[in-house]
C-alpha cells in the first residue's frame, strides 16, 4: 500500500497530468549539436541555449581535458576554504574586464547567484521590485530575501516608478532579466537605469540570455544599450548558455564583490565549480571575443526565421534574440504541435504554465550559431506543414 507521503504527492501529479502540465525528461545520447540523439532517435533540435555553438567546440573540450589533467576533476572545497584555484581567479578577472566592471565573482549556478545577490542586498525593511516576467530564480530570490516584494507590469516604466515613489523602503532594488527567457524580448534598460537614478534605487540585470550574444563584442545587453557599471551596478551572467560551459558570475564594483564574498550564503556554503569547468569557460570567452562571426551568423538566422515565419502567418513574439517563441495558447495545443514536429524529426519543447502565464503556452524556438541556413529552412517547412495540418487547426487556442 502506498505511504501517506506517496498518496499525497500522487494526487498533485495526477492534477498536473490532467492540466497537460506534466513534465518528463528526455534522455540525450549525443553531445550538444543541432542534431541530437534522444531516446534512440535523431532530431534536428531548436531547443538548446547553446546560442554560439560552443558547448562541443574542440578548443573548449581540450581546455577542460588539459585542466582536468592538471587540477583533477573537482575543486574539493568552497571558494573560501581551499577551492579557489588560479583557473577560477583568472576567469573572474577576464569576466570583469570583458564586461567593463571592476570585479567579477563566480557562482556555481545562475539560480544560486540570483538568490545570493538579492538576499545579500535587501532584507527586512527593504524593497525589491521585479518585472512580472522575470526568471523564477529572480522571483524566488525576492520572495526569500525577506524584503517587501513587488512585481511591476512587464517592461512598464511608469508602473515601476509609481511603485518606487510610494515605498518607504530603506533600500530599493530593481531586478530585471536583460533578455526575458521565455519571451525573448529585452528589458528597456536605459529607461530603467534612468528611473533607478531618479528614485535612488539599485538596478540588477540578469543577463543569462544576452551575455555572449548581444552587444558589439558579445558583452550582453548592457553593452548593447551602452550602459556602464554606474548605471547598472549589479550584473549577473550565466556561463552555460552562450558560452557553452557551466556556472554563473556577478560583476560590479570592488565593494559589491567583497560584500558578496562575505555575506552571500549561496556563495559561501557550497563547493566551487570544478577547475576544468573554469578552464573550459576561459576558452569559450576567448572564442566569443575572437570569432564575432558567430554572433553575426545567429542574427542572420534570426532574420531568416522571422521573415519565413511571417510569410507563414505564424505568431512570433517580439524578439531580436536567439529566443524566438511561437505563441500557441493552450497547453494541449502546444503539446500537440511539439509532438507533431517530433514525428517529423524536429525537436522543440512546449513551454506551459506555471513557467508561463495561463493561456500563453508556446513553442520556445532557439537558434544557434551551429545551425545552418538550410536547417532553418527545414524548420520553416516543417512548421508550415504542421501548423496548417487539419489536426492542429482543429485544436482550440485556449
Swiss-Prot record:
Binding sites annotated in the UniProt record for pyridoxal 5'-phosphate: 110-111, 181, 209, 238
Pathway(s) per entry: Cofactor biosynthesis; biotin biosynthesis
Keyword presence, Ligase: no
Cofactors (names): pyridoxal 5'-phosphate
InterPro entries referenced in this protein's UniProt entry, alphabetically: Aminotrans_II_pyridoxalP_BS, Aminotransferase_I/II_large, AON_synthase_class-II, AONS_Archaea/Proteobacteria, AONS_Proteobacteria, PyrdxlP-dep_Trfase, PyrdxlP-dep_Trfase_major, PyrdxlP-dep_Trfase_small
Top enzyme class: transferase
Pfam families: Aminotran_1_2 (PF00155)
GO molecular function annotations of the record: 8-amino-7-oxononanoate synthase activity; pyridoxal phosphate binding
Residues noted as binding substrate in the record, renumbered to the chain: 23, 135, 355
EC number(s) reported in the record: 2.3.1.47
Catalytic activity reported: 6-carboxyhexanoyl-[ACP] + L-alanine + H(+) = (8S)-8-amino-7-oxononanoate + holo-[ACP] + CO2
Keywords assigned by UniProt, alphabetized: Biotin biosynthesis, Pyridoxal phosphate, Transferase
GO biological process: biotin biosynthetic process
In-chain residues carrying the UniProt-annotated modification N6-(pyridoxal phosphate)lysine: 241
Quaternary data: Homodimer.
NCBIfam families named among the record's database cross-references: bioF
Function, in words: Catalyzes the decarboxylative condensation of pimeloyl-[acyl-carrier protein] and L-alanine to produce 8-amino-7-oxononanoate (AON), [acyl-carrier protein], and carbon dioxide.
Protein family (similarity comment): Belongs to the class-II pyridoxal-phosphate-dependent aminotransferase family. BioF subfamily.
UniProt name for this protein: 8-amino-7-oxononanoate synthase
Organism from which the protein derives: Cellvibrio japonicus (strain Ueda107)
Amino acid at each position: 500500500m502506498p505511504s501517506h507521503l506517496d498518496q499525497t504527492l500522487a494526487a498533485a501529479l495526477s492534477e498536473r497530468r490532467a492540466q497537460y502540465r506534466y513534465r518528463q525528461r528526455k534522455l540525450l545520447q549525443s553531445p550538444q549539436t543541432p542534431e541530437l540523439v534522444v531516446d534512440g532517435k535523431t532530431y534536428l533540435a531548436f531547443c538548446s541555449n547553446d546560442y554560439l555553438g560552443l558547448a562541443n567546440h574542440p578548443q573548449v573540450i581540450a581546455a577542460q581535458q588539459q585542466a582536468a589533467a592538471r587540477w583533477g576533476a573537482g575543486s574539493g572545497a568552497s571558494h573560501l576554504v581551499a577551492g579557489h584555484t588560479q583557473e577560477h581567479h583568472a576567469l573572474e578577472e577576464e569576466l570583469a574586464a570583458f564586461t567593463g566592471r571592476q570585479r567579477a565573482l563566480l557562482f556555481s549556478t545562475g539560480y544560486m547567484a540570483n538568490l545570493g545577490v538579492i538576499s545579500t542586498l535587501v532584507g527586512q525593511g527593504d524593497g525589491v521590485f521585479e518585472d512580472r516576467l522575470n526568471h523564477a530564480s529572480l522571483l524566488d530570490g525576492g520572495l526569500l530575501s525577506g524584503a517587501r516584494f513587488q512585481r511591476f507590469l512587464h517592461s512598464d516604466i511608469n508602473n515601476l516608478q509609481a511603485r518606487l515613489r510610494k515605498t518607504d523602503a530603506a533600500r530599493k532594488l530593481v531586478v530585471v532579466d536583460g533578455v526575458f527567457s521565455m519571451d525573448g524580448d529585452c528589458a528597456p534598460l536605459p529607461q530603467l537605469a534612468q528611473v533607478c537614478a531618479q528614485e535612488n534605487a539599485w538596478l540588477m540585470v540578469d543577463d543569462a540570455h544576452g551575455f555572449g550574444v548581444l552587444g558589439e563584442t558579445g558583452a550582453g545587453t548592457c553593452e548593447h544599450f551602452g550602459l556602464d557599471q554606474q548605471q547598472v551596478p549589479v550584473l549577473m551572467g550565466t556561463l552555460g548558455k552562450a558560452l557553452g560551459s557551466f556556472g554563473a558570475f556577478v560583476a560590479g564594483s570592488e565593494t559589491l564583490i567583497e560584500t558578496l564574498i562575505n555575506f552571500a550564503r549561496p556563495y559561501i556554503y557550497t563547493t566551487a565549480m570544478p577547475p576544468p569547468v573554469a578552464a573550459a569557460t576561459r576558452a569559450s570567452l576567448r572564442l566569443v571575443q575572437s570569432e564575432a562571426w558567430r554572433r553575426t551568423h545567429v542574427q542572420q538566422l534570426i532574420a531568416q526565421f522571422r521573415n519565413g515565419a511571417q510569410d507563414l502567418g505564424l505568431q512570433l513574439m517580439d524578439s531580436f534574440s536567439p529566443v524566438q517563441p511561437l505563441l500557441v495558447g493552450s497547453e494541449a495545443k502546444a503539446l500537440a504541435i511539439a509532438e507533431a514536429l517530433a514525428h517529423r524529426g524536429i525537436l522543440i519543447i512546449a513551454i506551459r504554465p506555471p513557467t508561463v502565464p495561463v493561456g500563453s503556452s508556446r513553442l520556445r524556438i532557439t537558434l544557434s550559431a551551429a545551425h545552418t541556413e538550410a536547417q532553418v529552412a527545414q524548420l520553416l517547412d516543417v512548421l508550415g506543414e504542421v501548423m496548417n495540418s487539419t489536426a492542429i487547426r482543429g485544436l482550440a487556442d485556449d
